Amino acid sequence: MQAVVVCGLGRFGLQVVESLCGCGCGVTVIADERTTAERLERAAAAGARIVRGDFRARITRAAAGLADCRAAVLTTSSDVDNLEAALEIRGEAPAVRVVMRHSQPQLCRRFEADFGIAAALTPADLAAGAFVAAALAVPSAAAPAARRPAMLPRRPVRVEFIAIPLLLVGIYLAAIVVFHFSLGLSWIDAVYFTTTVVTTVGFGDINLQHAPVAVKLFGVALMFAGVLLIAITASLLAVFVLTGTAEKLRNELRARRLRDHVVVCGLGSVGTAVARDLSGRGIPVVVIDPVADDEMHRETNPRCPVIVGDATRPVILHRAGIERARALVACTSNDALNLEIGLTAQSVAEASRSGRPLRLVMRCFDADLARRIHAVSDNYTLVSEAKIAAEVFVRRALEPA
């Protein structure tokens, strides 16, 4: 059997190499100088031949025997590098099947149709279905058992957002009372006159020309106070809108209305694919992510509320409605962080969901860690995106020409 050349030995590339070697296929892997010694050792132990160098260089590809190989699999996380190498391989060796990793699924079909690439695949999209299936593997919690409602933490409110408007309303009401009794105005006229003074747009139909000195001084002070307080209120409103506070509150209110939803922690490529898949199935989703202005955040937000914050904090999980959710999916790119999120969610669930288990699904790169956790606990489902996607890459690479 002709060898398959794998370009890149990152976490995903190593999984592809091990899967190919497990199929009894000869493998040559091109690894650059940044590849860790551990990955090189694991690839060699699996039976792969290793060529050191940059897979974008023709001389390196020639040393790997790419022109005579069965297929070339481009596994790095750089879309540009993968596409550049794929096009060069198509020109150098048209008979070689090219299987390429790319992060934009909407472009993959164009690459296959226009450039003759055998398969352009997005690992996140390939694995999203497995995360969704794991999250939906238990019945929905439509009928929670009667219990004493838990005291949920409230979002802290900045004092100035309450004090300034209250002060403005207080001054406004006091001025109405003063003008009603001192000038003999009716209540509606006092309201009208106070409004014209505070906003400094008086029409002259009512004025303080013949009013007592004390009332005139009060009117002067009211004008200054009105201008100042209105300016401060306008600035606070601008801060409330422009800093994203209004959007955060809107998302939290949307999340508060949801029931039987799935909480997705981490809005990377996998998290976005999982949220998109769930939304497409009509399953309500709440996303937790620490980055507020990320492009993927803006892409996901119209479909589901995004809570900005650290998913390892119970207060953030409560804002996402963890006590009403059917499942939580932790899909960041860090195994330790995913485990911490899962443990925190389990603690919160035990405190706020009596008799209703929370399905916990965690993304995991380390197969040994997954085995250890599954050996001692059934509360957590660990899914390896790399392993699931690697099997698809291998299958496409070994398809008949």
Tell me the role of every PLM-derived stretch.
Residues 1-401:
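Cytosolic regulatory regions of ion transport systems
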